[in-house]
Amino acid sequence: MRQLLANARRHEAQMVRLLGRFVRAESPSTDKAAVDRFGRLVAAEWRGHGARVRILRQRAYGDHVRAELFLGRGRPRGQILVLGHLDTVYDVGTLARTPFRIARGRAWGPGTFDMKSGLVIALFAVDALRRAGLRPSRRLVFLWTS
């Protein structure tokens, strides 16, 4: 556990940069186009980390993103499903009034806590498993909905 925590600390600046990119990509629940744009950004990040990604098209609300990885050997023995969401409750334009920033050791901005930091943590958690040489025997599936 200490190794994983130390690893996370070494990558903190990268995590904060990605969180800033995610927060600046406004994605209000009621704006399908904005959620879809953010979903494409999230999908690209997961692809860049070796995941097989599918965009699950939705008619009325933002598309869902499914990212899948298997770090183990042989065949997966089941899967672990991690759920989250891409949309936020903040209207487009909120960012102009409440920009992303780091103050007093904390990140601030629309969607920072719910749920964009969780999306960043999930991505870096997979990288941490790899760097630690941990190979879960189950497929890792991440489903980000809107």
What does each of the following model-derived ranges do?
Residues 1-110, 128-137:
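Acidic/His- and Gly-rich active-site-bordering loop/insert found
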Residues 115-146:
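Acidic/histidine-rich catalytic neighborhood of metal-dependent amide-processing enzymes
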